[in-house]
Every structure is written in structure tokens, then in C-alpha cells.
Amino acid sequence: MTETIKLMKAHKSVRRFKEQVLPQEDLTEILTAAQMASSWKNFQSYSVIVVRSQEKKDALYELVPQEAIRQSAVFLLFVGDLNRAEKGAQLHTDTFQPQGVEGLLISSVDAALAGQNALLAAESLGYGGVIIGLVRYKSEEVAELFNLPDYTYPVFGMALGLPNEEHEVKPRLPLTQVVFEEEYQEQTVDAIEAYDRVQADYAGARATTSWSQRLAEQFGQAEPS
């Protein structure tokens, strides 16, 4: 097994950080690695906002009350960005069509790929982090806080810093439930209940709801919880 694969398999979210600065040299390495992620047609339809200011992190916390935001050495906001595409298109045409869902997917996937590269790079340097998708639930307020222009939107945030907590890698679904040969295999309730038990064994006394209950809370209503 290569060192890269070992690092990937050891991934765990970190939400508590030591009070220590993340040096610019390391941050540049992390962001450069992020930029080398795959991108649809090399459009690179995302931007990253680096947040070091405690005042700005506190303001974001008021919108998205996740303690990792305030504790982080650096908070990265990954932005789906078609504003750059608009500027480029203006060189050749008077019209710009962001393409609805397709444009949303292009920029979201580009941002996600860059984000995964960034987190992996950070972990390789000894840092930890956590993805914060709740910024989408306050997208208008977050956009205003960070002065986002037209054709941009917050996809997710990433809190980074030196870990100040230790816990085990969270068990994933069995590979046979997410990887299928040649065609899709329908999910079974028995398999989901089995994974509920695996998650319960992992969480122990910390568990308040099962994995499938959290699915119901998220997808059992029209609006996200």
C-alpha cells in the first residue's frame, strides 16, 4: 500500500484545533494542490476565499454555528464560480447563459474536486479539517458577507488547523454496497439495517440517532434540515 493510499484510508474529520497559525508556505502548498484537481474542460469554475480574520470567522459563525469555524487556523470558502466564465464569454459574445442545473453541477463538482485535493494535501502536512456544507443553507447571507458577485454561490467551507482531538476512522459502507459490476444493484433494507448496527457499535454511547434515521431527517422533507 502506498503512503498516499494510507493517508486516504486514515481520513477523519477534525473539528477541534490547537491555537496555532497555519504558515503561508503550507497554505500555498495546500491551495496549489487544490488547483491541480480535475476540472470540466479546464474551466476551473470555482474560487476559494481564505479567511484568517477572527472577526470574519466569528461573523460566519453567527450565520453557521459550527465551532470548528471559530477554532480553525484558516477557513476556506469554496465558491462555485461562473462569474469568470461570464467575463470570458464577453470577449466573444453579447450573451451569457449559465445553463441552469448544468452550470450548477459544473461549478459544484469543480469546487468539490478542488476541495478534496486541498484536504488531502493539508492532511499530508499534518493538519486536519472538516467540510462544512451548512454554508449553503445561508447562501444569501454568506454571499453578502464575502462580497460574492453574480453567478457565484458558496458550495462548502473547510476549517483547517492542527488537530486537538483524537478519534477513530468512521466506518464506511461495505464496498459491495457502493461499487457494482456492470450495472446498478438495488439497495436492500437489510443491508442498511446492518450498517446501522455498524455505526451504532462505532458511536457507542454517543449515538442518539441511527444512520438511517439521519437519512430520514434529511430527505424525509421538502426542505433540508
Language model segments and positions:
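Acidic, surface-exposed loops and disordered segments
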Residues: M1-S225
